[in-house]
């Protein structure tokens, strides 16, 4: 049996989204039989992503929207012949606590519009940070790990 392959791709300005991505990656990696890759959106050749079973995209909230870097990455992905079947998104935000930040919702919509062949396998995760530069609010990182485990468990059943 071939193992599942998941690529966690993030953009970050102050390191908070990267830290969130690392915890999501750990949650996925702790499920046996799933091969993972991890990288910064600006450094990834989009063609590398084509053969993964799932991609997880994470971006900081910039003025209520996903970062420009992540938007450009999704635009580039739209021009690749993806074998990928599944996608999930997450993001970091500052401000009042809310179940799902609006930038995460916008990233979900963007992915569904530009990559219509991908199935959204989980509602997005919003990770709250203190102020613009962080750090991540206490209690948020375990949510990242749990998000990774949840995605891995869903993928195992597909």
What residue ranges belong to the model's regions?
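Aromatic-flanked redox-active Cys/Sec active sites in thiol-based oxidoreductases
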Residues: 10-14
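A short, well-ordered alpha-helical element
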Residues: 43-45
């Amino acid at each position: 049996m071939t193992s599942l392959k998941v690529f966690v791709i993030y953009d970050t300005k102050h390191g908070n989204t990267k830290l969130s991505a690392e915890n999501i990656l750990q949650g996925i990696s702790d499920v046996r039989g799933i091969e993972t890759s991890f990288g910064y959106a600006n450094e990834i050749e989009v063609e590398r992503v084509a053969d993964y079973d799932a991609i997880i995209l994470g971006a900081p909230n910039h003025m209520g929207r996903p970062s420009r870097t992540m938007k450009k990455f999704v635009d580039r992905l739209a021009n690749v012949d993806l074998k990928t079947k599944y996608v999930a998104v997450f993001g970091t935000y500052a401000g009042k606590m809310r179940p799902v930040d609006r930038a995460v919702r916008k990233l979900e919509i963007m992915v569904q519009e530009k990559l219509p062949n991908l199935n959204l396998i989980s509602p997005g995760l919003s990770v709250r940070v203190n102020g613009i530069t962080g750090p991540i609010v206490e209690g948020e990182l375990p949510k990242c790990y749990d998000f990774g485990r949840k995605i891995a468990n869903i993928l195992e059943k597909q």
